[in-house]
């Protein structure tokens, strides 16, 4: 009960509670820096090997994630380019060529298709002569 509220109030009380018992000699030195680097100080004082490894370790996946995130917008851009370039090309083709293709089952059942002009199948009366 006592640990929760001080932790939520600010970082000054946990360093004062945690630093004097383990490093008594260096406690006063950390006292001045405690409010700023208290949580980090614990990690460095606790195990010196842990803070360096999570840094690069987390950096690697995050960087990989950033690369993937950068690639995904490129893919989205490429899809947007495809979407932007296909409708003008398909515009004339939609009215002419789609009549040779099978009838769109969604258009046949519902009378409409969510892909509309982008659909690869034949929409009678929409992208070709009615049946």
Swiss-Prot record:
A zinc finger (C3H1-type) spans 98-126. Residues 12-25 have a biased composition (Pro residues). Disulfide bonds: none annotated. Transmembrane segments: none annotated. One of its GO terms (molecular function) is zinc ion binding. Residues 28-44 have a biased composition (Gly residues). It comes from the Eukaryota. Pfam families: zf-CCCH. Residues 1-77 are annotated as: Disordered. InterPro entries: PRR3 (IPR042805), Znf_CCCH (IPR000571), Znf_CCCH_sf (IPR036855). Keywords: Metal-binding, Zinc, Zinc-finger. This is Proline-rich protein 3. It comes from Sus scrofa (Pig). The lineage of its organism: Eukaryota, Metazoa, Chordata, Craniata, Vertebrata. The gene is PRR3.
């Amino acid at each position: 009960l006592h640990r929760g509220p001080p932790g939520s109030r600010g970082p000054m009380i946990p360093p004062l509670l945690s630093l004097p018992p383990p490093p008594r000699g260096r406690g006063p030195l950390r006292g001045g820096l405690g409010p700023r680097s208290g949580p980090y100080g614990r990690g460095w004082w606790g195990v010196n090997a842990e803070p360096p490894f999570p840094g690069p370790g987390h950096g690697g996946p995050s960087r990989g994630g950033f690369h993937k995130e950068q690639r995904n917008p490129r893919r989205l851009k490429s899809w947007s380019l495809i979407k932007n370039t296909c409708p003008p090309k398909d515009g004339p083709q939609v009215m002419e060529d789609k009549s040779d293709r099978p009838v769109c089952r969604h258009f046949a059942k519902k009378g409409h298709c969510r892909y509309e002009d982008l659909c690869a199948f034949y929409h009678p009366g929409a992208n070709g002569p009615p049946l």
